[in-house]
């Protein structure tokens, strides 16, 4: 079975939300938005590990959150980058080598001298045996006896030296540009699958996660979509109406998006060679830079809406008080 990693991107600042705090830390239905998203992947039998990518200024807040409510599958908390694509790459590099294969626990070790006391440390359970981390009564991630680092034990939740500078600002690593590209192949099951999810979609369900993983059995990439119900118009640079697209041919995009790890790495390797590259989602990177890859379209869910405006909280509170499908 492939090893499946969920990357939860929680690095946004929420400028449209109109709050001093990033919206992923907003309370709704008794928990933060981020906690709701983590819980859905934690409860999915398809997911082996979870990584959280967060703005460098909020690393400690996420660590504290996870100490209060441990999630055994969360094995990495990583500093995000300046742009969305930088955050994705930082998250991928926390788990994977540049060829898309899984790092072993020693390779994951972080020796950051800036980490706060009691940073969580543990070897991700089951990496050597291929099994997923298992929940225990007392999670090893936050126990006092694990506060000392050793050569055999990777430091998790450490500041990522590749993604945050000494003053807390972002930096960008383009090392993928120097990696030789192997031929893309989707014939065999991948050793590693990656699901990438926006933290501010807390209504994601276990059934949706399962459908994305099912699509990855026959496709290298899976995108989550919904039909467009409103009429849309296209405008020009001056804001003047120019065209009315056929909405029957349009879809709204959601997350989680799923990938065979080597395919996603190759898409980003090609993208980083483009000086005009900028991504708003990861499937679009594959679509643009790896056009030879067929992308599966998975039906999304209305409950999986993206928290964007304060008014969305009322709708999300309704969904989040209902049992997850």
Predicted regions and their residues:
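Conserved alpha/beta core of the MobA/IspD/sugar-nucleotide pyrophosphorylase nucleotidyltransferase superfamily
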Residues: 82, 251-325
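N-terminal glycine-rich phosphate-binding loop and ensuing alpha1 helix
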Residues: 2-62, 75
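Hydrophobic C-terminal alpha-helix "anchor/cap" residues
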Residues: 40-42, 66, 95
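Conserved beta-loop-beta/alpha segment of the NTase-like Rossmann-fold superfamily
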Residues: 84-109, 187-235, 254
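Short, flexible, basic/aromatic active-site loop/helix in glycosyltransferases
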Residues: 234-259
């Amino acid at each position: 079975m492939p090893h499946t990693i969920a990357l939860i991107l929680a690095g946004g600042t929420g400028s449209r939300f109109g709050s001093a705090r990033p919206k992923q830390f907003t309370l709704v239905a008794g928990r933060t938005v981020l906690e709701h998203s983590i819980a859905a992947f934690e409860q999915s039998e398809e997911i082996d590990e979870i990584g959280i990518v967060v703005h460098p200024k909020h690393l400690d807040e996420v660590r504290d959150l996870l100490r209060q409510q441990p999630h055994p599958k969360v094995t990495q908390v990583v500093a995000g980058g300046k742009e969305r694509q930088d955050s994705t790459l930082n998250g991928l590099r926390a788990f994977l080598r540049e060829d898309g294969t899984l790092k072993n626990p020693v390779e994951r070790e972080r020796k950051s001298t800036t980490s706060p006391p009691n940073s969580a440390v543990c070897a991700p359970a089951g990496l050597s045996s291929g099994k997923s981390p298992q929940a225990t009564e007392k999670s090893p991630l936050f126990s006092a006896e694990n506060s000392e680092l050793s050569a055999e034990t990777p430091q998790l939740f450490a500041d990522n030296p590749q993604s945050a500078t000494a003053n807390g600002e972002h930096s960008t690593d383009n090392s993928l540009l120097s990696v030789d590209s192997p031929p893309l192949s989707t014939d065999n099951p991948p050793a590693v699958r990656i699901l990438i999810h926006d933290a501010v979609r807390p209504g994601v369900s276990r059934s949706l996660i399962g459908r994305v993983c099912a699509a990855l059995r026959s496709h290298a990439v899976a995108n989550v979509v919904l039909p467009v119900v409103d009429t849309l118009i296209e405008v020009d640079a001056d804001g003047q109406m120019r065209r009315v697209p056929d909405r029957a041919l349009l879809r709204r995009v959601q997350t989680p998006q799923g990938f065979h790890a080597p395919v996603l790495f190759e898409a980003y390797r090609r993208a980083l060679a483009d000086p005009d590259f900028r991504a708003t989602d990861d499937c679009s990177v594959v679509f643009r830079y790896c056009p030879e890859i067929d992308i599966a379209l998975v039906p999304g869910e209305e409950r999986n809406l993206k928290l964007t405006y304060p008014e969305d909280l009322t709708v999300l509170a309704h969904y989040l008080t209902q049992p997850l499908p």
